[in-house]
């Protein structure tokens, strides 16, 4: 898998913007082409061995941790291990650091509840701890996830 640092002149914005639009509901959508304009954001695009775009991650460096603002894998590439590879690369890139993120809180009344549960299981398989502390953004409840220093490492 090849990793590319995304800059404002990134040629594949349309592909990755479409990937995001498919993966996230409108209230959570922040397109990579808009994210790249922010000074503190470092977007990483990932490509398979065949050169096809497979995913994207947005790690934000904080003083004592790394915040994983975004992880997305193209729907046609899911189930092939790319998400795990991306997370493992981030763990290698930031050794000894706590990596924090968030996932949507399960809600049986929501039509996307199964997708929310799948995301939680994905992170748990990789060794993340789900903290039942929630935060609310865009009218959505999220749970905090973490791995690394002070967490139940894998």
Q: What residues fall within each predicted segment?
A:
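Conserved beta-strand in the GNAT
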Residues: 45, 51-60, 65-72
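Conserved acetyl-CoA-binding loop-helix of GNAT-fold acetyltransferases
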Residues: 73, 79-93
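C-terminal "cap" of GNAT-fold acetyltransferases
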Residues: 115-116, 132-154
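Conserved acetyl-CoA-binding loop of GNAT-fold acetyltransferases
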Residues: 119-131
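Short acidic/glycine-enriched loop/turn segments that link adjacent beta-strands
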Residues: 40, 64, 137-141
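Conserved GNAT acetyl-CoA-binding A-motif
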Residues: 94-115
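Short amphipathic alpha-helix that is part of the acyltransferase structural core
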Residues: 1-31, 47
């Amino acid at each position: 898998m090849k990793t590319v640092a995304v800059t404002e002149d990134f040629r594949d914005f349309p592909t990755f913007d479409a990937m995001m639009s498919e993966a996230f509901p409108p209230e959570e959508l922040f397109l990579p082409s808009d994210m790249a304009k922010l000074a503190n954001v470092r977007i990483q695009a990932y490509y398979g061995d065949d050169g096809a775009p497979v995913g994207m991650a947005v790690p934000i460096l904080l003083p004592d941790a790394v915040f994983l603002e975004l992880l997305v894998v193209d729907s046609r590439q899911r189930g092939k291990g790319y998400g795990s590879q991306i997370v493992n690369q981030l763990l290698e890139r930031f050794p000894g650091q706590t990596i924090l993120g968030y996932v949507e809180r399960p809600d049986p009344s929501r039509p996307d509840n199964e997708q929310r549960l799948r995301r939680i299981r994905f992170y748990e398989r990789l060794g993340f701890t789900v903290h039942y502390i929630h935060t609310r953004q865009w009218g959505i409840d999220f749970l905090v996830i973490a791995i690394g220093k002070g967490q139940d490492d894998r």
